[in-house]
Amino acid sequence: MMSSITKKPIKNYLECGCNIGRNIDQLKLAMPSLVPSIIEISKPAFDYVTSHHNFEHAFNGAILDSKLPNSHFDLVFTMGVLIHINPEQLIDHLRHMFDYSNKYVLIGEYFNRTPISIEYQGQKDRLFKRDFGKLFIENFPVE
């Protein structure tokens, strides 16, 4: 991915589900000139991360409720978030990510060749593994 970024550099990014901002901390160290934006559903995590970082856009709520500018972000990414989205709503979440991006979408999630639901913290239907990349490519026009 980094070799692609040198061909089409990025100036800003949106993290969907940033929690307390660990990825933001690392991106700030690696690429300090990037302008960050976030979507975070947890109010305590949102309050924490917004007290430690400045954002172009910061939305506290679900991605499906967000109204950020389309085609605005050079990179839209999520890490360990989509695995918790009910499969019936997954395409809608991916569509928001696709719509917000103007260059790159990065999905870092648990992988399984076939969709599977796994018990998570003693609860059923809270963690879903699948091939998220394949699902994205099959549903959105990507290069």
Language model features with spans:
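Nucleotide-sugar donor-binding/catalytic module of glycosyltransferases
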Residues: 80
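A short His-aromatic
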Residues: 83-85
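Class I (Rossmann-like) S-adenosyl-L-methionine-dependent methyltransferase catalytic domain
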Residues: 1-68, 88-92, 96-143
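A conserved beta-strand element that flanks and buttresses the S-adenosyl-L-methionine
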Residues: 77
